[in-house]
Protein backbone atom coordinates (compact mmCIF):
# COMPACT_ATOMS: atom_id res chain seq x y z
CA UNK A 1 0.00 0.00 0.00
CA UNK A 2 1.54 3.33 -1.07
CA UNK A 3 2.22 6.17 1.34
CA UNK A 4 1.27 9.86 1.26
CA UNK A 5 2.64 12.10 -1.46
CA UNK A 6 5.15 14.89 -1.04
CA UNK A 7 3.99 18.51 -0.86
CA UNK A 8 6.02 20.67 -3.23
CA UNK A 9 4.54 23.97 -2.09
CA UNK A 10 1.41 25.95 -2.93
CA UNK A 11 2.68 27.17 -6.30
CA UNK A 12 3.62 23.67 -7.40
CA UNK A 13 0.26 22.28 -6.26
CA UNK A 14 -1.66 24.98 -8.14
CA UNK A 15 0.38 24.33 -11.27
CA UNK A 16 -0.21 20.59 -11.26
CA UNK A 17 -3.76 20.75 -9.83
CA UNK A 18 -4.48 20.42 -6.08
CA UNK A 19 -7.62 18.34 -6.55
CA UNK A 20 -5.90 15.78 -8.76
CA UNK A 21 -2.94 15.55 -6.43
CA UNK A 22 -5.25 14.98 -3.51
CA UNK A 23 -7.02 12.28 -5.50
CA UNK A 24 -3.73 10.52 -6.07
CA UNK A 25 -2.85 10.66 -2.39
CA UNK A 26 -6.19 9.27 -1.29
CA UNK A 27 -6.18 6.48 -3.85
CA UNK A 28 -2.67 5.20 -3.21
CA UNK A 29 -3.21 5.28 0.57
CA UNK A 30 -6.29 3.11 0.47
CA UNK A 31 -5.57 0.84 -2.49
CA UNK A 32 -6.24 -2.86 -1.99
CA UNK A 33 -3.91 -4.79 -4.29
CA UNK A 34 -5.16 -8.27 -3.44
CA UNK A 35 -5.06 -10.48 -6.51
CA UNK A 36 -2.54 -8.32 -8.32
CA UNK A 37 0.45 -10.03 -9.96
CA UNK A 38 4.09 -9.01 -10.45
CA UNK A 39 5.60 -8.11 -13.81
CA UNK A 40 9.24 -7.28 -14.49
CA UNK A 41 9.80 -3.84 -16.03
CA UNK A 42 13.04 -3.05 -17.83
CA UNK A 43 14.90 -0.03 -16.51
CA UNK A 44 17.90 0.70 -18.72
CA UNK A 45 20.21 -2.29 -18.38
CA UNK A 46 18.39 -3.47 -15.24
CA UNK A 47 14.81 -4.22 -14.24
CA UNK A 48 12.45 -4.19 -11.26
CA UNK A 49 9.07 -5.75 -10.42
CA UNK A 50 5.77 -3.89 -10.05
CA UNK A 51 2.26 -5.17 -9.42
CA UNK A 52 -0.53 -5.01 -12.00
CA UNK A 53 -4.11 -6.32 -11.84
CA UNK A 54 -4.29 -10.10 -12.08
CA UNK A 55 -6.22 -10.04 -15.36
CA UNK A 56 -3.80 -7.68 -17.10
CA UNK A 57 -2.86 -8.67 -20.66
CA UNK A 58 0.86 -9.29 -21.16
CA UNK A 59 1.85 -8.38 -24.72
CA UNK A 60 5.13 -10.00 -25.73
CA UNK A 61 7.14 -10.83 -28.83
CA UNK A 62 7.71 -14.28 -30.27
CA UNK A 63 10.91 -16.03 -29.22
CA UNK A 64 13.01 -17.10 -32.21
CA UNK A 65 16.18 -19.16 -31.79
CA UNK A 66 19.38 -17.58 -33.15
CA UNK A 67 21.40 -19.21 -35.92
CA UNK A 68 23.65 -22.01 -34.70
CA UNK A 69 26.38 -21.22 -37.25
CA UNK A 70 25.96 -17.55 -38.24
CA UNK A 71 29.21 -17.48 -40.20
CA UNK A 72 28.15 -20.36 -42.43
CA UNK A 73 24.73 -18.80 -42.95
CA UNK A 74 26.34 -15.48 -43.89
CA UNK A 75 28.43 -17.17 -46.59
CA UNK A 76 25.46 -19.18 -47.84
CA UNK A 77 23.31 -16.06 -48.16
CA UNK A 78 25.97 -14.30 -50.22
CA UNK A 79 26.28 -17.28 -52.56
CA UNK A 80 22.51 -17.76 -52.99
CA UNK A 81 21.08 -14.23 -53.14
CA UNK A 82 17.36 -13.44 -53.17
CA UNK A 83 16.03 -12.16 -56.50
CA UNK A 84 19.48 -11.28 -57.75
CA UNK A 85 22.48 -12.58 -59.62
CA UNK A 86 25.47 -13.49 -57.48
CA UNK A 87 28.10 -10.83 -56.90
CA UNK A 88 30.67 -12.47 -59.23
CA UNK A 89 28.08 -12.46 -62.04
CA UNK A 90 27.20 -8.84 -61.29
CA UNK A 91 30.89 -7.94 -61.56
CA UNK A 92 31.15 -9.67 -64.94
CA UNK A 93 28.22 -7.58 -66.23
CA UNK A 94 29.99 -4.27 -65.60
CA UNK A 95 31.88 -4.27 -68.90
CA UNK A 96 35.45 -4.05 -67.68
CA UNK A 97 37.95 -6.27 -65.86
CA UNK A 98 37.21 -6.89 -62.18
CA UNK A 99 40.66 -5.55 -61.30
CA UNK A 100 39.58 -2.14 -62.61
CA UNK A 101 36.16 -2.01 -60.93
CA UNK A 102 35.54 0.30 -57.99
CA UNK A 103 33.31 -1.04 -55.22
CA UNK A 104 31.55 1.04 -52.58
CA UNK A 105 29.96 -0.55 -49.51
CA UNK A 106 27.71 1.64 -47.39
CA UNK A 107 27.55 0.76 -43.68
CA UNK A 108 25.62 1.94 -40.66
CA UNK A 109 27.25 4.05 -37.97
CA UNK A 110 27.89 3.18 -34.32
CA UNK A 111 24.24 3.85 -33.35
CA UNK A 112 23.16 0.59 -35.03
CA UNK A 113 24.42 -2.82 -33.80
CA UNK A 114 25.03 -4.25 -37.27
CA UNK A 115 27.29 -7.35 -37.11
CA UNK A 116 30.17 -6.32 -39.37
CA UNK A 117 33.27 -7.97 -37.91
CA UNK A 118 34.29 -11.42 -36.70
CA UNK A 119 33.28 -14.93 -37.71
CA UNK A 120 29.58 -14.03 -37.87
CA UNK A 121 30.06 -10.59 -39.41
CA UNK A 122 29.06 -9.26 -42.83
CA UNK A 123 32.41 -7.86 -43.96
CA UNK A 124 34.84 -10.84 -43.83
CA UNK A 125 32.87 -13.11 -46.23
CA UNK A 126 31.69 -10.18 -48.36
CA UNK A 127 35.21 -8.84 -48.87
CA UNK A 128 36.57 -12.35 -49.45
CA UNK A 129 33.93 -12.92 -52.14
CA UNK A 130 34.82 -9.65 -53.88
CA UNK A 131 38.55 -10.30 -53.80
CA UNK A 132 38.04 -13.88 -54.98
CA UNK A 133 36.26 -12.46 -58.02
CA UNK A 134 39.18 -10.17 -58.82
CA UNK A 135 38.36 -6.92 -56.99
CA UNK A 136 41.49 -5.15 -55.74
CA UNK A 137 41.62 -4.04 -52.12
CA UNK A 138 42.59 -0.47 -53.03
CA UNK A 139 39.44 -0.19 -55.17
CA UNK A 140 37.10 -0.88 -52.24
CA UNK A 141 35.66 2.00 -50.19
CA UNK A 142 33.49 1.70 -47.09
CA UNK A 143 31.20 4.69 -46.53
CA UNK A 144 29.69 5.11 -43.07
CA UNK A 145 26.12 6.25 -43.72
CA UNK A 146 25.77 8.91 -41.06
CA UNK A 147 22.72 10.79 -42.37
CA UNK A 148 22.76 13.89 -40.17
CA UNK A 149 24.75 12.17 -37.40
CA UNK A 150 28.30 13.18 -36.54
CA UNK A 151 31.29 11.43 -38.16
CA UNK A 152 32.45 8.21 -36.54
CA UNK A 153 35.65 8.33 -34.49
CA UNK A 154 38.68 6.13 -35.23
CA UNK A 155 37.88 4.07 -32.13
CA UNK A 156 34.27 3.60 -33.26
CA UNK A 157 35.45 2.40 -36.67
CA UNK A 158 37.59 -0.26 -34.97
CA UNK A 159 34.64 -1.25 -32.77
CA UNK A 160 32.39 -1.61 -35.81
CA UNK A 161 34.71 -3.12 -38.40
CA UNK A 162 37.71 -4.56 -36.55
CA UNK A 163 41.37 -3.54 -36.67
CA UNK A 164 42.22 -5.45 -39.85
CA UNK A 165 39.55 -3.77 -41.98
CA UNK A 166 40.38 -0.34 -40.57
CA UNK A 167 44.07 -0.87 -41.30
CA UNK A 168 43.69 -2.11 -44.88
CA UNK A 169 40.63 -0.42 -46.39
CA UNK A 170 39.60 3.13 -47.19
CA UNK A 171 36.80 4.14 -44.82
CA UNK A 172 35.08 7.53 -45.09
CA UNK A 173 32.15 9.15 -43.31
CA UNK A 174 29.30 10.62 -45.31
CA UNK A 175 28.72 14.34 -44.82
CA UNK A 176 25.24 15.62 -45.62
CA UNK A 177 26.53 19.23 -45.69
CA UNK A 178 29.60 18.81 -47.92
CA UNK A 179 28.43 20.03 -51.33
CA UNK A 180 31.61 18.83 -53.05
CA UNK A 181 30.96 15.27 -51.82
CA UNK A 182 27.40 15.21 -53.20
CA UNK A 183 25.96 14.90 -56.70
CA UNK A 184 22.55 16.01 -57.97
CA UNK A 185 20.75 13.15 -59.74
CA UNK A 186 17.37 14.79 -60.25
CA UNK A 187 14.07 14.79 -58.39
CA UNK A 188 11.68 12.17 -57.09
CA UNK A 189 8.10 11.90 -58.28
CA UNK A 190 7.05 13.99 -55.26
CA UNK A 191 9.53 16.73 -56.18
CA UNK A 192 12.33 16.00 -53.71
CA UNK A 193 15.78 17.07 -54.89
CA UNK A 194 18.10 14.04 -54.78
CA UNK A 195 21.61 14.90 -53.67
CA UNK A 196 23.52 11.66 -53.14
CA UNK A 197 27.01 10.80 -51.91
CA UNK A 198 29.28 11.20 -54.93
CA UNK A 199 31.67 8.36 -54.06
CA UNK A 200 28.81 5.88 -53.73
CA UNK A 201 26.99 7.05 -56.83
CA UNK A 202 30.08 7.00 -59.05
CA UNK A 203 31.29 3.56 -57.91
CA UNK A 204 31.02 0.76 -60.46
CA UNK A 205 29.51 -1.59 -57.88
CA UNK A 206 27.24 -0.35 -55.09
CA UNK A 207 26.52 -2.56 -52.06
CA UNK A 208 24.25 -1.51 -49.18
CA UNK A 209 24.44 -3.21 -45.77
CA UNK A 210 22.22 -2.72 -42.75
CA UNK A 211 20.24 -4.09 -39.82
CA UNK A 212 16.49 -4.51 -40.33
CA UNK A 213 14.41 -3.50 -37.32
CA UNK A 214 11.03 -1.84 -36.90
CA UNK A 215 10.97 1.88 -37.64
CA UNK A 216 8.12 4.05 -36.43
CA UNK A 217 8.31 6.35 -39.46
CA UNK A 218 9.62 4.31 -42.41
CA UNK A 219 8.06 0.99 -41.36
CA UNK A 220 11.39 -0.83 -41.12
CA UNK A 221 15.05 0.04 -41.34
CA UNK A 222 17.52 -1.53 -43.74
CA UNK A 223 17.28 -1.88 -47.51
CA UNK A 224 16.70 1.54 -49.06
CA UNK A 225 17.37 3.41 -45.80
CA UNK A 226 21.08 2.59 -46.17
CA UNK A 227 20.95 5.14 -49.01
CA UNK A 228 18.21 7.53 -47.87
CA UNK A 229 18.62 9.05 -45.35
CA UNK A 230 22.09 7.57 -44.77
CA UNK A 231 23.87 8.91 -47.88
CA UNK A 232 21.90 11.96 -48.99
CA UNK A 233 22.08 15.71 -48.39
CA UNK A 234 20.53 17.52 -45.46
CA UNK A 235 17.97 19.03 -47.82
CA UNK A 236 16.94 15.58 -49.05
CA UNK A 237 16.77 14.30 -45.46
CA UNK A 238 14.53 17.20 -44.49
CA UNK A 239 12.06 16.09 -47.12
CA UNK A 240 12.27 12.47 -45.93
CA UNK A 241 11.51 13.65 -42.38
CA UNK A 242 8.98 16.27 -43.44
CA UNK A 243 5.85 16.90 -41.42
CA UNK A 244 3.75 16.13 -44.48
CA UNK A 245 5.22 12.63 -44.84
CA UNK A 246 5.10 11.84 -41.12
CA UNK A 247 1.52 13.08 -40.83
CA UNK A 248 0.41 10.07 -42.87
CA UNK A 249 -1.18 7.28 -40.79
CA UNK A 250 0.82 4.85 -42.96
CA UNK A 251 4.14 6.32 -41.81
CA UNK A 252 4.37 3.84 -38.96
CA UNK A 253 5.88 0.57 -37.76
CA UNK A 254 6.01 -2.40 -40.17
CA UNK A 255 3.99 -0.62 -42.87
CA UNK A 256 5.70 -0.33 -46.26
CA UNK A 257 2.88 -0.17 -48.80
CA UNK A 258 1.62 3.39 -49.04
CA UNK A 259 4.16 4.64 -46.51
CA UNK A 260 5.47 7.94 -47.98
CA UNK A 261 8.78 7.70 -46.10
CA UNK A 262 9.44 4.19 -47.42
CA UNK A 263 8.38 5.04 -50.96
CA UNK A 264 10.55 8.15 -51.10
CA UNK A 265 13.63 6.34 -49.78
CA UNK A 266 13.07 3.41 -52.14
CA UNK A 267 12.76 5.65 -55.18
CA UNK A 268 16.02 7.39 -54.29
CA UNK A 269 17.87 4.11 -53.67
CA UNK A 270 16.65 2.73 -57.00
CA UNK A 271 17.64 5.92 -58.79
CA UNK A 272 21.23 5.72 -57.59
CA UNK A 273 21.51 2.10 -58.74
CA UNK A 274 22.12 -0.18 -55.75
CA UNK A 275 23.51 -3.47 -57.11
CA UNK A 276 23.30 -5.69 -54.03
CA UNK A 277 22.27 -5.56 -50.38
CA UNK A 278 23.18 -7.53 -47.28
CA UNK A 279 20.65 -7.16 -44.46
CA UNK A 280 20.53 -8.85 -41.07
CA UNK A 281 17.84 -9.42 -38.46
CA UNK A 282 18.87 -9.76 -34.81
CA UNK A 283 17.05 -10.69 -31.64
CA UNK A 284 17.04 -8.44 -28.57
CA UNK A 285 20.23 -10.08 -27.34
CA UNK A 286 21.86 -9.00 -30.62
CA UNK A 287 22.15 -12.59 -31.82
CA UNK A 288 21.85 -13.21 -35.55
CA UNK A 289 18.48 -14.61 -36.60
CA UNK A 290 18.94 -14.51 -40.37
CA UNK A 291 20.84 -12.94 -43.27
CA UNK A 292 19.18 -11.62 -46.42
CA UNK A 293 21.36 -10.83 -49.42
CA UNK A 294 20.49 -9.88 -52.97
CA UNK A 295 17.98 -7.55 -54.60
CA UNK A 296 17.27 -4.15 -53.03
CA UNK A 297 13.51 -4.75 -52.88
CA UNK A 298 13.08 -8.52 -52.69
CA UNK A 299 15.79 -9.33 -50.13
CA UNK A 300 14.64 -6.48 -47.90
CA UNK A 301 11.02 -7.61 -48.17
CA UNK A 302 12.03 -11.07 -46.93
CA UNK A 303 13.88 -9.51 -44.01
CA UNK A 304 10.83 -7.44 -43.08
CA UNK A 305 8.69 -10.58 -43.30
CA UNK A 306 10.86 -12.30 -40.70
CA UNK A 307 11.01 -9.16 -38.58
CA UNK A 308 7.23 -8.93 -38.56
CA UNK A 309 6.92 -12.56 -37.40
CA UNK A 310 9.20 -11.77 -34.46
CA UNK A 311 8.17 -8.32 -33.24
CA UNK A 312 4.51 -8.02 -34.26
CA UNK A 313 2.10 -8.70 -31.38
CA UNK A 314 -1.51 -9.36 -32.52
CA UNK A 315 -3.96 -7.05 -30.79
CA UNK A 316 -7.70 -7.62 -30.76
CA UNK A 317 -8.81 -4.70 -28.59
CA UNK A 318 -7.72 -1.41 -27.06
CA UNK A 319 -7.00 -1.01 -23.35
CA UNK A 320 -7.73 1.68 -20.79
CA UNK A 321 -4.29 1.58 -19.17
CA UNK A 322 -1.06 0.60 -20.93
CA UNK A 323 2.24 0.08 -19.12
CA UNK A 324 5.46 0.21 -21.14
CA UNK A 325 9.12 1.23 -20.84
CA UNK A 326 11.89 2.91 -22.81
CA UNK A 327 14.08 -0.19 -23.00
CA UNK A 328 17.82 -0.22 -23.51
CA UNK A 329 17.51 2.11 -26.53
CA UNK A 330 15.77 4.76 -24.43
CA UNK A 331 18.92 6.62 -23.45
CA UNK A 332 17.10 9.97 -23.50
CA UNK A 333 13.64 11.44 -23.97
CA UNK A 334 14.24 11.75 -27.71
CA UNK A 335 14.77 7.99 -28.07
CA UNK A 336 11.98 7.05 -25.66
CA UNK A 337 9.43 8.37 -28.16
CA UNK A 338 9.65 4.94 -29.82
CA UNK A 339 8.11 3.24 -26.79
CA UNK A 340 5.29 5.78 -26.54
CA UNK A 341 4.40 5.49 -30.23
CA UNK A 342 4.46 1.69 -30.06
CA UNK A 343 1.82 1.89 -27.32
CA UNK A 344 -0.62 3.85 -29.51
CA UNK A 345 -2.37 0.85 -31.09
CA UNK A 346 -2.88 -0.61 -27.61
CA UNK A 347 -4.41 2.33 -25.74
CA UNK A 348 -7.96 3.53 -26.28
CA UNK A 349 -8.61 7.22 -27.08
CA UNK A 350 -8.49 9.13 -23.80
CA UNK A 351 -6.79 6.22 -22.04
CA UNK A 352 -3.57 6.24 -20.04
CA UNK A 353 -0.02 5.34 -21.07
CA UNK A 354 2.37 4.84 -18.15
CA UNK A 355 5.96 4.93 -19.34
CA UNK A 356 9.02 3.93 -17.28
CA UNK A 357 12.06 5.92 -18.44
CA UNK A 358 15.74 5.54 -17.57
CA UNK A 359 17.69 8.27 -19.38
CA UNK A 360 21.42 7.43 -19.32
CA UNK A 361 22.65 9.97 -21.87
CA UNK A 362 24.71 13.00 -20.85
CA UNK A 363 21.72 15.05 -21.99
CA UNK A 364 18.73 13.10 -20.65
CA UNK A 365 16.19 15.01 -22.74
CA UNK A 366 18.02 15.57 -26.03
CA UNK A 367 19.76 18.29 -28.06
CA UNK A 368 18.85 21.96 -27.77
CA UNK A 369 16.73 22.06 -30.93
CA UNK A 370 14.73 19.10 -29.66
CA UNK A 371 14.24 20.73 -26.26
CA UNK A 372 13.03 23.92 -27.90
CA UNK A 373 10.54 22.13 -30.14
CA UNK A 374 9.39 19.96 -27.25
CA UNK A 375 8.63 23.10 -25.27
CA UNK A 376 6.67 24.41 -28.27
CA UNK A 377 4.65 21.19 -28.25
CA UNK A 378 4.05 21.55 -24.51
CA UNK A 379 2.80 25.13 -24.93
CA UNK A 380 0.69 24.71 -28.07
CA UNK A 381 -0.51 21.14 -27.68
CA UNK A 382 -0.45 18.49 -30.43
CA UNK A 383 -2.87 20.22 -32.81
CA UNK A 384 -1.12 23.59 -32.45
CA UNK A 385 2.30 22.04 -32.98
CA UNK A 386 1.16 20.22 -36.11
CA UNK A 387 -0.47 23.38 -37.46
CA UNK A 388 2.85 25.17 -37.09
CA UNK A 389 4.80 22.42 -38.87
CA UNK A 390 2.31 22.19 -41.73
CA UNK A 391 2.16 25.95 -42.23
CA UNK A 392 3.72 26.91 -45.60
CA UNK A 393 5.82 29.53 -43.83
CA UNK A 394 7.41 27.04 -41.42
CA UNK A 395 11.18 26.64 -41.84
CA UNK A 396 12.28 23.02 -41.40
CA UNK A 397 14.12 22.59 -38.11
CA UNK A 398 16.37 19.70 -37.17
CA UNK A 399 14.70 17.17 -34.84
CA UNK A 400 11.17 18.50 -35.50
CA UNK A 401 10.05 14.97 -36.40
CA UNK A 402 10.48 13.53 -32.90
CA UNK A 403 8.14 15.99 -31.13
CA UNK A 404 5.76 15.24 -34.00
CA UNK A 405 5.77 11.62 -32.83
CA UNK A 406 5.02 12.76 -29.27
CA UNK A 407 2.21 14.90 -30.71
CA UNK A 408 0.59 11.73 -32.09
CA UNK A 409 0.67 10.27 -28.57
CA UNK A 410 -0.84 13.37 -26.95
CA UNK A 411 -3.48 13.60 -29.64
CA UNK A 412 -4.81 10.20 -28.60
CA UNK A 413 -4.48 10.26 -24.79
CA UNK A 414 -4.10 13.94 -23.89
CA UNK A 415 -1.58 15.61 -21.61
CA UNK A 416 -2.96 13.90 -18.49
CA UNK A 417 -3.13 10.54 -20.24
CA UNK A 418 0.64 10.25 -20.59
CA UNK A 419 2.39 9.52 -17.29
CA UNK A 420 6.15 9.87 -17.76
CA UNK A 421 7.91 8.13 -14.88
CA UNK A 422 11.53 9.26 -14.81
CA UNK A 423 13.63 9.37 -11.66
CA UNK A 424 16.45 10.97 -13.67
CA UNK A 425 14.75 14.13 -14.94
CA UNK A 426 14.26 16.78 -12.29
CA UNK A 427 10.81 18.27 -11.63
CA UNK A 428 12.05 21.43 -13.38
CA UNK A 429 13.08 19.46 -16.48
CA UNK A 430 9.66 17.84 -16.52
CA UNK A 431 8.12 21.26 -17.18
CA UNK A 432 9.08 21.02 -20.88
CA UNK A 433 8.37 17.29 -21.22
CA UNK A 434 4.86 16.30 -22.39
CA UNK A 435 2.65 14.42 -19.98
CA UNK A 436 2.28 14.19 -16.25
CA UNK A 437 5.48 13.80 -14.24
CA UNK A 438 6.15 10.64 -12.26
CA UNK A 439 7.31 12.90 -9.43
CA UNK A 440 3.64 13.68 -8.74
CA UNK A 441 3.21 10.06 -7.62
CA UNK A 442 6.08 9.94 -5.13
CA UNK A 443 5.38 9.64 -1.39
CA UNK A 444 6.58 12.31 1.02
CA UNK A 445 9.31 9.99 2.27
CA UNK A 446 10.50 9.05 -1.24
CA UNK A 447 13.83 7.17 -1.19
CA UNK A 448 16.95 8.82 -2.60
CA UNK A 449 18.00 5.68 -4.47
CA UNK A 450 17.14 6.21 -8.16
CA UNK A 451 16.03 2.64 -8.80
CA UNK A 452 13.70 2.51 -5.80
CA UNK A 453 12.37 5.97 -6.58
CA UNK A 454 11.59 4.95 -10.16
CA UNK A 455 9.85 1.79 -9.02
CA UNK A 456 7.79 3.70 -6.43
CA UNK A 457 6.55 6.36 -8.83
CA UNK A 458 5.70 3.72 -11.43
CA UNK A 459 3.81 1.54 -8.96
CA UNK A 460 1.82 4.46 -7.60
CA UNK A 461 1.00 5.65 -11.13
CA UNK A 462 -0.38 2.19 -11.95
CA UNK A 463 -2.42 2.08 -8.75
CA UNK A 464 -3.95 5.50 -9.38
CA UNK A 465 -4.71 4.78 -13.04
CA UNK A 466 -6.57 1.58 -12.09
CA UNK A 467 -8.23 2.72 -8.87
CA UNK A 468 -9.09 6.27 -9.94
CA UNK A 469 -12.53 7.01 -8.41
CA UNK A 470 -13.49 8.94 -11.56
CA UNK A 471 -13.97 5.55 -13.19
CA UNK A 472 -17.17 5.27 -11.08
CA UNK A 473 -16.71 1.58 -10.40
CA UNK A 474 -15.77 0.61 -13.95
CA UNK A 475 -12.92 -1.90 -14.04
CA UNK A 476 -10.25 -0.73 -16.49
CA UNK A 477 -8.59 -3.09 -18.93
CA UNK A 478 -4.83 -3.09 -18.42
CA UNK A 479 -2.05 -4.21 -20.78
CA UNK A 480 1.71 -4.45 -20.26
CA UNK A 481 4.04 -4.25 -23.29
CA UNK A 482 6.78 -6.50 -21.97
CA UNK A 483 9.45 -5.59 -24.53
CA UNK A 484 8.61 -1.89 -24.62
CA UNK A 485 9.93 -0.20 -27.80
CA UNK A 486 10.95 -3.49 -29.42
CA UNK A 487 7.49 -5.05 -29.64
CA UNK A 488 5.09 -3.73 -32.27
CA UNK A 489 1.44 -4.27 -31.31
CA UNK A 490 -0.63 -4.67 -34.48
CA UNK A 491 -4.41 -4.51 -34.65
CA UNK A 492 -5.92 -7.70 -36.07
CA UNK A 493 -8.22 -7.36 -39.13
CA UNK A 494 -11.19 -8.34 -36.96
CA UNK A 495 -10.41 -5.56 -34.51
CA UNK A 496 -10.08 -3.00 -37.31
CA UNK A 497 -13.42 -4.08 -38.81
CA UNK A 498 -15.11 -3.88 -35.40
CA UNK A 499 -13.76 -0.38 -34.84
CA UNK A 500 -14.96 0.71 -38.30
CA UNK A 501 -18.44 -0.62 -37.52
CA UNK A 502 -18.55 1.34 -34.27
CA UNK A 503 -17.53 4.53 -36.05
CA UNK A 504 -20.04 4.09 -38.89
CA UNK A 505 -22.89 2.87 -36.77
For the regions a protein language model found, what residue spans apply to each?
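An N-terminal, well-structured beta->alpha segment
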Residues: 52-93
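Active-site segments that bind and position negatively charged phosphate/pyrophosphate groups
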Residues: 297-363
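C-terminal catalytic subdomain
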Residues: 333-420, 426
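Extended hydrophobic packing segments that form well-structured cores
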Residues: 17-60, 71, 416-505
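Conserved, well-structured core segments that form the ligand-binding/active-site neighborhood
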Residues: 166-318, 346
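N-terminal active-site beta-alpha-beta segment that forms phosphate/nucleotide-binding
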Residues: 87-150, 323, 336, 340-354, ...
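Well-ordered mid-protein domain cores that form the structural environment of catalytic cofactors
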Residues: 119-192
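Short helix/loop capping segments that flank catalytic or ligand/cofactor-binding pockets
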Residues: 50, 60, 114-115, 208-209, ...
Amino acid sequence: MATGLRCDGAARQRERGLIVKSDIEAVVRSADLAGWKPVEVEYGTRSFPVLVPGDSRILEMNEVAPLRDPGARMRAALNAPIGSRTLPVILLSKGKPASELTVCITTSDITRPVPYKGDSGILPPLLALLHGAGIRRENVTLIVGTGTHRPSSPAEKVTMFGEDVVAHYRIVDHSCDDAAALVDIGRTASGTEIWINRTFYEADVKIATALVESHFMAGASGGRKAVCPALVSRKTIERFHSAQFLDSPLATNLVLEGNPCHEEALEIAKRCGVDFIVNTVLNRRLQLLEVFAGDLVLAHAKAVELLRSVVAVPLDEEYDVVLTHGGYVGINHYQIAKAAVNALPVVRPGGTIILAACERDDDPIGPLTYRTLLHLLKLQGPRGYMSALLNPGWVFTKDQWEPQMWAKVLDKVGEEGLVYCSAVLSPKEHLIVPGRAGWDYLPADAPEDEMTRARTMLQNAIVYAVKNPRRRGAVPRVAFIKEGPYAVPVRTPAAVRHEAQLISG
